[in-house]
Amino acid sequence: MSGNSIGQNFVVTTFGESHGKALGCIIDGCPPGLELNEADMQRDLDRRRPGTSRYTTARREPDEVRVLSGIFEGKTTGTSIGLMIENTDQRSKDYSNIKDLFRPGHADYTYQQKYGLRDYRGGGRSSARETAMRVAAGAVAKKYLKQVHGIEINGYLSQLGPIKADTVDFSQIEQNAFFFPDESKLDELDEYMRKLIKSGDSIGAKVSVVATGVPVGLGEPVFDRLDAEIAHALMGINAVKGVEIGDGFGVVNQKGSEHRDLMSPEGFASNHAGGILGGISSGQPIVAHIAMKPTSSISIPGESMTAQGDVAEVVTKGRHDPCVGIRAVPIAEAMLAIVLMDHLLRHRAQNMDVNSQTPEIGMR
């Protein structure tokens, strides 16, 4: 398995499985001198960790991160940052019945065919449990981006099943268990999830993430365009089946006169492009959305097959999220932060001495 790292100048490598002893990651390329401690990472990990509300999995993991290397006297040293989170609430017996069964919609079959064996306990490496380390690494990137460059990243659940946010109030996002920005829809969300959980089914979701304060110039055309790298990072999150930048698939119904973001010395009149033009950041807010499938870990019986090729019926036991989009908000923030951090360092390496005579503009 060779796809465990992301980034070129800011490199994040994760390791570990859902029911293994621990999860871990190595961060290479973080500049020295950044004030950093475990509490900086723990805040985002607590937002992602399981067992925090009745709408998510009942698995209870403290997700307490330990710094193994790369930080001395409260500051990064410029060497590799080693992080680890121990798994403490595994119940591997919940998965003994699927040892030789393939759960439809999961990675069981493809992992078996690719590697010739698989860790069936909670999905092993394919489990979203792995994303805890992405969130920890993303918190390091977020700290640097905000402290050094004034860049802030905020994510939210913009749609759960048929329920969409009509307004986006960032002050509401951390005030409810859904990370939802529209207070008027919270009761509707609660009722919907209660019925869904009772039925034993699951539902999909849409998560949005916005980065403000991003300077002009990030992105490396042609193959490492900023939007391409963001899409790559977000698409690598478990259960993501679609990524949009700016208006995304909505551009299909737009005319050129509608979609183009008119500009003047006072700034851009709109942001249909999502803050990226020609693969390079424009200085506007970067806006991305991800579509997340409903998890296949449900208690409703489904047809499948055994590892020996026999027909079988599968009922997934264990503790699972009825909507994976809820806990994906800090994960999406982390992945966007990692990409922006990497591209800031790449841009600085090549273009630090560039001095354009054209004035920078933002949103009007």
UniProtKB/Swiss-Prot annotation:
FMN binds at residues 125-127, 238-239, 278, 293-297, 319. NADP(+) binds at residues 48, 54. GO terms for biological process: amino acid biosynthetic process; aromatic amino acid family biosynthetic process; chorismate biosynthetic process. Reduced FMN (FMNH(2)). Belongs to the chorismate synthase family. Keywords: Amino-acid biosynthesis, Aromatic amino acid biosynthesis, FAD, Flavoprotein, FMN, Lyase, NADP. It comes from the Bacteria. It comes from Shewanella sediminis (strain HAW-EB3). It catalyses: 5-O-(1-carboxyvinyl)-3-phosphoshikimate = chorismate + phosphate. InterPro entries: Chorismate_synth, Chorismate_synth_AroC_sf, Chorismate_synthase_CS. Signal peptide: none annotated. This is Chorismate synthase. One of its GO terms (molecular function) is chorismate synthase activity. Its cofactor is FMNH2. Pathway: Metabolic intermediate biosynthesis; chorismate biosynthesis; chorismate from D-erythrose 4-phosphate and phosphoenolpyruvate: step 7/7. One of its GO terms (cellular component) is cytosol. Its EC number is 4.2.3.5. Pfam families: Chorismate_synt. Homotetramer. The gene is aroC. This reaction introduces a second double bond into the aromatic ring system. CDD domains: Chorismate_synthase (cd07304).
